[in-house]
């Protein structure tokens, strides 16, 4: 049973909530620095801002303008949206509209869901944000629902059921509105669920289509699951895609196959660990590219897909770029899926290289052993990946991607076959992720994580700045020559985009696992990010640097101190 609370501010100085966010507004989002209308700050997900008021020379004067309590002790991974003087922010249990200049709450809509929902959430109770379109704010709800709210009042317009926790599903990602369709994905590969992407009518909430990411017998791709197509699982779609409105193509990443053990699912296991190009009106898959066929390592390929125009091979291309969890950075022609570049950007021993003629990885000898389920191996990157869901940014001025990357390996040990036979791999069962024993390998004395400035066509880092713990936050790059990101020890930092030098830092009192954004209001540039992390006992044992970081969610907004 859901409950809705509307809290109205009593001041007469609140901004007027405009009825905007047309398809044209969303298409032009990258060119409207006074707004943040989409996840990724534009359809391209470059997370680049043309604003320069906050720059290398002025950032030392950056101070908090206000902070808003999210009244939550879970992970605050949400990205704020900003329109006409209002910030819209989500947590797992609420959506709020806030005055950008004062931090005062305009309205708040609460959400409730059954306690058992947490049983099918793999890696934390969180929400990553929403979408704006035609006077509505769209979001997903953890227990498998999609919701539309009135942006003026916070009142619910529609609320529809997509999936159930009994089937092993959860929903944590921000929706994408493309060509008038609200598009969402699901989590659940660790619970043997079958991934899908869905499109909804923005006005009514009626489901328009569903595209499954793993086939059933007789469907295209079923031949890549020999003897297993009837039970194929995985391919979760738990982050948010990008959109090229000129090509009318949505690009969405898919997760790992289930179970982790690859012995009984020989074959490529399409369309897991892939990038899919989809028509938003119909859900038709136009092309796909798979990064990790027959994946035994949990290398979810759901990382942000960045759209840009770059020179590759002496020619200008409309490309998509992805720093993947498996340690390779892929550049594809987004018109047809042709692979243009694939290079390691982090330590990756599971594959020697990517064969550019076939587009397939050349497996290492160690990977072949684990695929045959015969003996333990050491492998890089670890199960969390060279990066994870937290989005990178790209500057068209420097031509570099700014990526938070982990520097951790893993020892894999296959479970005995007799134990595998006892596992229940039915949808909704946790065993989907428990068929291989893992032990992390930490570098000593090297940093466990880096912020890297990477040439996307070569994978080479112009610079890298080390951190004791891997950062779990998104990055933001600006024309002011700065990269903003957060640390798990609670600092928001500003880094020189050309050198990697940390120029400014601020302690927010809880770990930052959110996504910084910037915009301007009445001639003043602001930076906003969520703060709030929750670490389980295992995480605290493995990383003493985050063992004592407090919990507690907040939304922080900064501006320059007047001279």
Where are these regions (language model features)?
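Sec/Tat signal peptide C-region and signal peptidase I cleavage site
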Residues: 16-20
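Aromatic (tryptophan-biased) beta-strands that constitute blades/sheets of beta-rich domains
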Residues: 21-70, 104-119, 155-164, 206-214, ...
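Repeat-blade elements of multi-bladed beta-propeller folds
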Residues: 36-40, 73-92, 119-145, 170-194, ...
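Blade-loop segments of beta-propeller domains
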Residues: 68-82, 92-134, 164, 287, ...
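Hydrophobic or amphipathic alpha-helical targeting/insertion segments
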Residues: 100, 105, 128-162, 167-213, ...
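Blade-level signature of beta-propeller repeat domains, shared across WD40, Kelch, NHL, RCC1
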Residues: 516-563
């Amino acid at each position: 049973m859901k409950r809705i609370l509307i809290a109205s501010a009593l001041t007469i100085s609140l901004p007027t909530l405009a009825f905007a966010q047309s398809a044209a507004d969303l298409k032009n989002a990258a060119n409207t620095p006074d707004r943040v209308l989409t996840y990724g700050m534009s359809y391209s997900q470059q997370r680049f801002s043309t604003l320069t008021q906050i720059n290398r020379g002025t950032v030392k004067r950056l101070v908090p303008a206000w902070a808003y309590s999210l009244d939550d002790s879970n992970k605050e991974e949400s990205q704020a949206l900003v329109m006409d003087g209002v910030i819209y922010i989500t947590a797992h249990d609420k959506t709020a509209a806030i005055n950008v200049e004062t931090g005062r709450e305009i309205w708040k809509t609460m959400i409730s869901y059954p306690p058992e929902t947490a049983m099918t959430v793999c890696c934390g109770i969180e929400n990553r944000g929403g979408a704006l379109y035609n006077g509505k704010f769209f979001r997903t709800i953890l227990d498998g629902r999609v919701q539309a709210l009135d942006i003026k009042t916070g009142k619910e317009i529609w609320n529809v059921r997509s999936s159930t926790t009994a089937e092993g599903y959860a929903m944590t990602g921000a929706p994408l509105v493309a060509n008038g369709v609200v598009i969402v994905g699901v989590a659940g590969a660790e619970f043997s669920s079958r991934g899908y992407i869905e499109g909804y009518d923005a006005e009514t909430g009626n489901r328009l289509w569903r595209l499954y990411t793993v086939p059933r017998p007789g469907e295209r791709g079923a031949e890549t699951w020999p003897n297993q197509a009837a039970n194929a699982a995985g391919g979760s779609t738990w982050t948010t895609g990008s959109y090229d409105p000129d090509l009318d193509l949505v690009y969405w990443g898919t997760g790992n196959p289930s179970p982790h053990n690859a012995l009984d699912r020989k074959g490529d296991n399409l369309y897991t660990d892939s990038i899919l190009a989809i028509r938003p009106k119909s859900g038709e898959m136009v092309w796909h590219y798979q990064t990790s066929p027959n994946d035994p390592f949990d290398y979810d390929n759901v990382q942000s897909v960045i759209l840009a125009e770059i020179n590759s091979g002496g020619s200008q291309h409309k490309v998509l770029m992805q720093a993947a969890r498996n340690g390779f950075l892929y550049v594809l022609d987004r018109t047809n899926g042709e692979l243009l570049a694939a290079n390691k950007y982090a330590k990756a021993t599971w594959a020697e290289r990517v064969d550019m003629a076939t587009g397939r990885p050349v497996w290492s000898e160690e990977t072949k052993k684990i695929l045959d389920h015969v003996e333990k191996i050491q492998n890089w990157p670890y199960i969390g990946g060279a990066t994870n869901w937290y989005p990178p940014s790209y500057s068209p001025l420097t031509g570099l991607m700014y990526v938070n990357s982990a520097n951790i390996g893993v020892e894999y040990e296959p479970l005995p076959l007799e134990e595998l036979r006892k596992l229940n791999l039915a949808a909704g069962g946790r065993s989907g992720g428990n068929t291989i024993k893992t032990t992390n390998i930490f570098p000593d004395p090297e940093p466990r994580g880096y912020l890297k400035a990477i040439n996307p066509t070569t994978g080479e880092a112009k610079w890298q700045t080390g951190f004791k713990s891997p950062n779990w936050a998104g990055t933001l790059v600006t024309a002011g020559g700065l990269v903003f990101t957060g640390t798990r020890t609670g600092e928001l930092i500003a880094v020189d985009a050309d050198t990697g030098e940390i120029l400014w830092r601020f302690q927010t009192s809880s770990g930052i696992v959110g996504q910084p954004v910037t915009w301007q209001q009445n001639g003043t540039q602001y930076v906003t990010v969520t703060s709030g992390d929750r670490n389980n006992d295992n995480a605290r044992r493995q990383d003493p640097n985050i063992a004592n970081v407090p919990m507690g969610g907040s939304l922080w907004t900064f501006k320059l101190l007047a001279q």
